[in-house]
């Protein structure tokens, strides 16, 4: 079980690194989507993403030129700020 969590957190760090370094719209929207799914499905997902200091970058992407990046960033911020059950209700 430890090995599985270690792998998950390595992938999560990679996603946050891509989020901070990439300028490609498709990459940014996929990273926001992946982080929002992690926040929604992991019991401590919000706190882990906040500890990785990804919130500021995600919030800055809400002003991106690409509408898909803005949409995914907004959904991710909703899940960061709200509990998972309320965020999933707003998404549908």
Region locations from a protein language model:
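Long amphipathic alpha-helical tracts in eukaryotic proteins
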Residues: 1-92
